[in-house]
Amino acid sequence: MKREAIAYEAEYKEKVKDRPQMTLSQLAEIYLEDYKTNRKPTSYALTKQNIYSYILPTLGNMNIEELSPIIIKKWQNHLLTLGRSQSSIKAYNTSFNSMLNWAVKYCGLSQNPFKVTGVTGTIRKRLEFLEENEWKKLNDVISDKFDKALFNLLFFSGIRIGEARALTKDDMDFTTNTITISKTHNLVSGISSPKTKNSYRKVVIPEQACKYIKEMFDAFYTLPEYPFQFRIPRTVAAHLKSYCIKAGVTVITPHGFRHSHASMLIRRQVPINAIASRLGDTVAEVLRTYSHCYKEQDSEIAALLETI
């Protein structure tokens, strides 16, 4: 690897002698301008934050042709000193790599040094979710009406937390116990269209979950337009962690309820098309995300057949 990097460095210096000057900061400006027109606001905001917070402060004044593998490697090592998670480091690397790939295609950058260094960081593969018996223990210790309503909604519907935060009273039909998903919410762009066209859907939930939601509504003196935005996400996550610890169950994030719901349906052998429709995903996305559940199910079926 070291010999390859040195050779690559020498090749870089030879190629960049007559190249026009462009700093990484200048590249970032035009790259993000293009990125903004082709991506959703949330994706743009996250990419911009990655670039301005973790790339430009150390490398912004450099000519893009001077970004050799050695420099990229030093930057990657610097990230390790910041105490960031592996998934965050992966995101910073991916944003940087994508920007340089764009520069190769549109700005005449000779080569992308990430082809030598690779992208560092890892994505957490293990999904945190609750077994059904854990959910019952957790639900028993939830005392706050807002938390009770939100967590029951998330567990029994599998909707995304952003979709829950975008719900209005009109989106909930308590006669049929049906929730209509037609929008989502995030702290960057506020209310916006759902993640994909598959995300537009109607989801039926148990009557008991609806009862908790109605009780929460009744507790408000004046019902907000978006009731589930009553608490900020950080507070919701902190409350959930506290409840999980108190109940002695797996500590999950609010998104973990979505994984819990999907895993529960898979283990009850609900058809995958129905699961995908309920989650607002494609069948391929369900298989990719929850393949471990299907493998476990296959093992259980094989063990059952051995007894025949």
Q: Where would I find each of the regions flagged by the language model?
A:
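Conserved tyrosine-mediated DNA breakage-rejoining catalytic core shared by Y-recombinases
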Residues: N133, A166-E215
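Active-site/catalytic core of tyrosine-dependent DNA strand-transfer enzymes
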Residues: T176, P206-T250
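N-terminal core-binding DNA-recognition domain of tyrosine site-specific recombinases/integrases
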Residues: P20, L32-P113, R124, R231-T235, ...
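Short, leucine-enriched amphipathic alpha-helices that occur as contiguous helical runs
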Residues: Y92, W135, F146-K148, P233, ...
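DNA/chromatin major-groove-contacting recognition/catalytic segments
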Residues: K137, G190-S193, T289-I308
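Short, surface-exposed polybasic/aromatic micro-patch for ligand or macromolecular engagement
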Residues: M1-Q21, T196
